[in-house]
């Protein structure tokens, strides 16, 4: 056990250059690469992402107002209708674009909201 403690002390006292050289020597001696664990770790999320691909079908969407366009007053009116906000709150939302208009809505509702706002000249995105 004292040998291990001594080894830890010696390794702790190495400079960065000495530690890099030690790493190279150990790679050669043991026939391994220090980069291998990184490659394995990078592959794990990719595999997890592939497994999650079927679940990728979103059921809830956020409607984002990117800009109000030329007909800001009409967009404010539609925002009030869609969200139930008061005049000041709807105006602040429109003037503060990009802002989320509605969160967690289904795809059909998100598309309807987008269509209504775009008819008024707004630029809208769905996430």
UniProtKB/Swiss-Prot annotation:
Show the GO cellular component annotation of the record. cytosolic large ribosomal subunit
Identify the InterPro entries for this entry: Ribosomal_bL12, Ribosomal_bL12_C, Ribosomal_bL12_C/ClpS-like, Ribosomal_bL12_oligo, Ribosomal_bL12_oligo_N_sf
Which biological process terms from the Gene Ontology are attached to this UniProt entry?
translation
- Keyword Coiled coil recorded: no
Alphabetically sorted, this entry's keywords are: Ribonucleoprotein, Ribosomal protein
> Which GO molecular function, any one, fits this protein according to its record?
structural constituent of ribosome
- Alphabetized CDD domains for the sequence: Ribosomal_L7_L12 (cd00387)
Keyword Transmembrane (UniProt): no
- What Pfam families does UniProt report for this protein, alphabetically? Ribosomal_L12 (PF00542), Ribosomal_L12_N (PF16320)
- Family matches, as Gene3D superfamilies: 3.30.1390.10, Single helix bin
Q: Which HAMAP family match?
A: Ribosomal_bL12
Q: How does it assemble?
A: Homodimer. Part of the ribosomal stalk of the 50S ribosomal subunit. Forms a multimeric L10(L12)X complex, where L10 forms an elongated spine to which 2 to 4 L12 dimers bind in a sequential fashion. Binds GTP-bound translation factors.
Question: What this chain does, per the record?
Answer: Forms part of the ribosomal stalk which helps the ribosome interact with GTP-bound translation factors. Is thus essential for accurate translation.
Q: Which family does it belong to?
A: Belongs to the bacterial ribosomal protein bL12 family.
How is this protein named in the record?
A: Large ribosomal subunit protein bL12
Give the source species: Acidiphilium cryptum (strain JF-5)
Q: Which gene encodes it?
A: rplL
